[in-house]
């Protein structure tokens, strides 16, 4: 068989989540600072997420993943009133150290391996949002940094099977993940010259 060119190994997919919070609302004054801006007064139909994913295994040892979100709130983008700003959620590459990709470094902006719920994709979770405790600890669930993952082949196959069978899965975050991060959350410059 003819080996595929690197650009033939790139895939494109995406998803959108829309919500309306006023249907069962009993108190429009209730707010949630960590949540989306459709909760509370003046909430209506709201595009919670509109994401495209570009990804691919471009060589034996290099995998890339880029995910922009076209439904970001301007409150996290610099303006106080607008909706639906494009913003990078994930932009990283995995550099594998072995042929089975069991040992790898993830370099760039990605999810922080901070608990099971944080590593689950929002398209695979039942609730649209993560718990308030997690949203307070790791806003945006992401940061810029370098993470080392140990992901045995048989465990990665189990994670893939869980998702394929429609069960809750986390994706390919391995068994052990340890890293260093800016500590400022996603799309923010380093603010104190101290890594976390």
Please place each PLM-identified region on the residue numbering.
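Outer membrane beta-barrel
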Residues: 3-183, 191-195
């Amino acid at each position: 068989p003819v080996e595929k060119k690197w650009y033939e190994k790139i895939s494109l997919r995406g998803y959108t989540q829309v919500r309306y919070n006023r249907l069962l609302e009993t108190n429009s004054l209730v707010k949630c600072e960590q949540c989306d801006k459709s909760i509370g007064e003046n909430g209506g139909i709201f595009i919670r997420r509109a994401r495209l994913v570009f990804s691919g295994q471009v060589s034996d040892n290099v995998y890339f993943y880029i995910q922009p979100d076209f439904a970001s709130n301007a409150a996290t983008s610099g303006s106080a009133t607008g909706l639906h700003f494009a913003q990078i959620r994930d932009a990283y590459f995995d550099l594998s150290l072995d042929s089975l990709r069991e040992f790898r470094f993830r370099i760039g902006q990605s999810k922080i391996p901070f608990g099971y719920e944080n590593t689950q994709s929002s398209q695979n979770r039942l609730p649209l949002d993560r718990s308030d405790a997690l949203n307070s600890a790791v806003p945006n669930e992401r940061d810029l940094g370098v993470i080392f993952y140990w992901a045995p082949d048989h465990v990665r196959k189990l994670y893939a099977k869980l998702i394929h069978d429609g069960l809750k899965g986390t994706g390919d975050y391995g068994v052990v993940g340890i890293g260093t991060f800016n500590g400022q959350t996603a799309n923010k410059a380093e603010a104190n010259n101290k890594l976390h």
